[in-house]
């Protein structure tokens, strides 16, 4: 009987729950923007509007930093297949973004790029972990007991290391919990180190068209190589529509701009209008260089 608030995204979540309960034809959420974009305009000023997305794509984007929509808000609409529309409060006549079960095939494999900043990369390393069952279970059990949410997981096939990202603010608690859990292994050299790397971020490439697309990973990492960007850790699910990379946080703008240029074209306008107020020596020299 207690009254509680639902937190961030609570009003959207309420709307989609009601939409599902009432078997609505559609649910429309009004925002201060036109809809979901191919990238955060803070990094890519002329990012493109996304006309439509699948539920899975929208959930991935919202989880990995697209704050316009909370991932929880989509859940009630998936089973009844009710479409969700995101529209601008001030321009409701604009089409916005449609999120639904049936999405027309895009000519581009990637739908959008997104990033989560303020992360810390926690790693548990040691040759004594190889072939020992239960290490991953104990690792994430320790996180669960401290109510620490994990945003990305990457593990070496040799089982000699496992790393994952959490909020930077949870870093000290996570390290303390893990060192307590693996106290015996640390003392006996079975686990060599448990450490946390500060100031990292996750950049995610999302799109249903990525599934089965040959050479896409090479395209991503080739673009990073050209931009001299280093990848600290990588994660990709079996669904194949998300490639997530951990990088240094200060490199996020360059990483997003690089990938947006790679998959969506140049962000530089083809035409620039220039007005010269006067035609002195400086103006004459400038026109000769154009």
Model regions and ranges:
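C-terminal catalytic "cap/lid" subdomain
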Residues: 1-270
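Glycine-rich adenosine-cofactor-binding loop
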Residues: 272-290
